[in-house]
UniProtKB/Swiss-Prot annotation:
InterPro entries per record: dsDNA_mimic_put (IPR007376), Put_dsDNA_mimic_sf (IPR036763)
SUPFAM superfamilies given in the database record: Putative dsDNA mimic
Source species taxonomy: Bacteria, Pseudomonadati, Pseudomonadota, Gammaproteobacteria, Pasteurellales
Entries under Pfam families matching the protein: DUF440
HAMAP family (UniProt xref): Put_dsDNA_mimic
Protein name: Putative double-stranded DNA mimic protein HS_0995
Origin: domain of life: Bacteria
Gene3D superfamilies noted in UniProt: dsDNA mimic, putative
Function description: May act as a double-stranded DNA (dsDNA) mimic. Probably regulates the activity of a dsDNA-binding protein.
Protein family according to the UniProt entry: Belongs to the putative dsDNA mimic protein family.
Length: 107
């Protein structure tokens, strides 16, 4: 039997991802990237809720059901409003009682 759960709304997923990003970026990003992010985020920063990719197994080594997770990207957007410098990709469980997440940081 399939377990029912309420999916995260985009704003909540974005808030969760951004909070985690701010807390962990210093430990996971190159100091140059942190400086770039801090200098340009106000004008070019973006936190985007995107369609959950089905290739997370390659990133985290675990097969996931894309319907059970939200995906959020944190980065900088260019003049065409496309995110072309991604600092972190987040995979966040929709299950509130078991809110697990995975992060792929910019290398």
């Amino acid at each position: 039997m399939t377990e029912k759960f309420k999916k995260l709304d985009p704003d909540t997923a974005i808030d969760i991802a951004y909070d985690i990003f701010l807390e962990m970026a210093g430990e996971n990003l190159d100091p140059t990237d942190i400086l770039l992010f801090n200098l340009q985020f106000e004008d070019h920063g973006g936190v985007e809720f995107v369609e959950t990719a089905d290739d997370w197994e390659q990133e985290i080594g675990v097969l996931i059901d894309p319907d059970e997770y939200a995906e959020v990207w944190v980065g900088l957007v260019n003049e065409q409003d496309e995110m072309d410098d991604i600092f972190a990709k987040f995979l966040i469980s929709h299950k509130e009682e078991d809110r697990e997440y995975h992060v792929v940081w910019k290398k």
